[in-house]
């Protein structure tokens, strides 16, 4: 049997842009994404602390430092300046669960890394 477990999290990131006319996804600063073990195309769940919205999308790696941009239809669920939690999950069996520790990255209001 497998269980969906927290794989990684970027905690309290700030939305820097929302692009309704893009195809979809969330663009995340590449360095930040890699530190959080997020990969291009990986499914993530976004939780907006300001308005309570919760939605799923996939990761695109961004070039701008500190960039967190929600794209496509999901751009209607956030506002620039909103604080979000970006979560990724992985399917794990009992042995993997026992050995796993989620990667948690804390950031400040400019999406600069505070702690990993």
From Swiss-Prot:
Major localization listed first in the record, in broad terms: cytoplasm
Family: Belongs to the PanD family.
Listed Gene3D superfamilies: 2.40.40.20
Modified residues (Pyruvic acid (Ser)): 25
Protein name in the entry: Aspartate 1-decarboxylase
InterPro entries referenced in this protein's UniProt entry, alphabetically: Asp_de-COase-like_dom_sf, Asp_decarbox
Record CDD domains: Asp_decarbox (cd06919)
Organism whose genome encodes this protein: Helicobacter pylori (strain HPAG1)
Top-level taxonomy: Bacteria, Pseudomonadati, Campylobacterota, Epsilonproteobacteria, Campylobacterales
């Amino acid at each position: 049997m497998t269980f969906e477990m927290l794989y990684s999290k970027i905690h309290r990131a700030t939305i820097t842009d929302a692009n309704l006319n893009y195809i979809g996804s969330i663009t995340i600063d590449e360095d930040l994404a890699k530190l959080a073990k997020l990969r291009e195309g990986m499914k993530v769940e976004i939780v907006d602390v300001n308005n309570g919205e919760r939605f799923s999308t996939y990761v695109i790696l961004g070039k701008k430092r500190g960039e967190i941009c929600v794209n496509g239809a999901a751009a209607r669920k956030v506002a620039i300046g909103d604080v979000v939690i970006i979560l990724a999950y992985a399917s794990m069996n009992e042995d993997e669960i026992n050995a796993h520790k989620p990667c948690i990255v804390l950031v400040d209001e400019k999406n600069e890394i505070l702690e990993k």
